[in-house]
Design a protein with these regions (language model features):
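N-terminal nicking endonuclease/strand-transfer module with a His-rich metal-binding environment
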Residues: 1-281
Length: 281
């Protein structure tokens, strides 16, 4: 099956530096950008400013990243062309800027693309807000109504608080708001199907074509073991158990047992028991 996963990026500039650095990546074959560093610097700054103004808890998400595993047959193709084809496909479909890199892991067993994308687009013109009266911001960057709310007991403005005077710019936007579709399940499902089809276009043997994993099938998915994963042995053992179930399911199908019956056993013997185990902890 194809392997495509998505993650949130609280530090997009740091992540871009990491995936595109030959000094930090042992097997880096190609990099590609659809926008320059200024775009990503501005995106990160505006995302943090908006997050501060919102007063929301947790981490500020500046961008998102896809990891797309490629079959080893792809090592035969020109790396830069592969990377640009996959990145341009995303930009064509969703109209957002991207940075990407094509890697092998240290043992050269996992050929994959990192594709970072923005959830926002540049506005045609910056949206600049001018203060019609004095505007006050507290230490967290949150706007407050009165000067009194940022004044200390000594009558002075508290450290870290700011005042924007009438006629000055108090807020500016270079970007649109985030596109909500990128955090919804249908988007990731669509991306998986789209990239699986793109991968298969360059695999001549139909028997080697990849499929998007169907969670409603008789099979169990295996998990990717990342670099320096402290749970590597545990995941490997779990994968072995899952592969044993998948072989058993294959044999059952070949021997003529109906798929519905296998799904019933999968539900009662695996999903239900795991659910009960979690609830009893």
């Amino acid at each position: 099956h194809s392997f495509i996963q998505m993650s949130k990026l609280p530090n997009v500039k740091g992540r871009i530096s990491y995936i595109t650095s030959h000094a930090r990546q042992e097997n880096l074959y190609a990099t590609y950008r659809t926008a320059d560093n200024a775009f990503w610097n501005n995106l990160a700054r505006e995302s943090r400013q908006e997050f501060q103004r919102s007063g929301a808890e947790g981490k500020c998400i500046e961008a998102r990243e896809l990891i797309i595993a490629l079959p080893e047959v792809y090592t035969q193709y020109e790396p830069q062309q592969v990377l640009e084809d996959f990145t341009d496909e995303f930009r064509r479909r969703y109209g957002v800027e991207c940075v990407s890199a094509l890697h092998h892991n240290k043992r050269k067993t996992n050929y994959h693309i990192h594709l970072i994308f923005s959830e926002r687009k540049l506005l045609p013109e910056p949206d600049v807000k001018i203060a019609t009266r004095s505007v006050f911001f507290d230490e967290t960057g949150k706007r407050v109504r009165t000067k009194k709310e940022i004044t200390g007991e000594d009558g002075q403005i508290r450290k870290g608080c700011t005042i924007i005077k009438k006629g000055e710019v108090y807020e500016s936007h270079l970007f649109t708001v985030k596109d909500d579709r990128f955090k919804r399940e249908p988007f990731l499902r669509e991306v998986k199907e789209d990239y699986t089809n793109l991968i298969n276009l360059h695999i001549e043997n139909p028997e080697q074509h990849l499929k998007v994993f169907d969670k409603n099938s008789v099979y169990l998915p295996t998990k990717k073991i990342g670099k320096n994963n402290p749970k590597a042995e545990e995941i490997a053992a779990d994968n072995a158990t899952r592969q044993e179930w998948n072989r058993t399911a294959d044999m059952a199908l070949v021997s003529g047992i109906e798929e519905a019956k296998i799904l019933e056993i999968k539900q009662t013997e695996i999903h239900d028991k795991v659910s009960q185990s979690i609830k009893s902890e």
